């Protein structure tokens, strides 16, 4: 799933320099674009409390038809059933101690990058069963894990740790990368 997405994104960046030739002119009916694609909105929802939604990072699991969304203001990973995309249904989320910054899914496992309440301290990568939402494992990451992804073969998890300084710059952890070997269950 990720490889075609990466290829599509790379093609989009490459072809964006040619897009002006295909946009048309004001008042003209737009065509279907370079690849014959036309996007149509089929549904929308607000993730989070109040009028403001939170959906910075999300990951979709095709088997369960669930969308997992980082929701830092509510301290959770929100879970949505989008088997009917025009009518998404919010399910029980995953409450966390710390702030979720990123999510990814691979073959029945959800990985969550969790920021420590003290941003300069090490965060964690938490793994959950995609169906039951039960915690499977937790691994220590560097300071402020800001991105998490599975390797294409699912053998590894990689996290980018931002390492943000405190307000007066007396503590400034270095940025780092965490690599987790899932077979050996070690960092």
Predicted regions and their residues:
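Sec-dependent signal peptide recognition
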Residues: 2-8
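Bacterial N-terminal signal peptides
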Residues: 8-16
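Mobile, glycine-rich extracellular loop/lid and propeptide segments
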Residues: 30-187
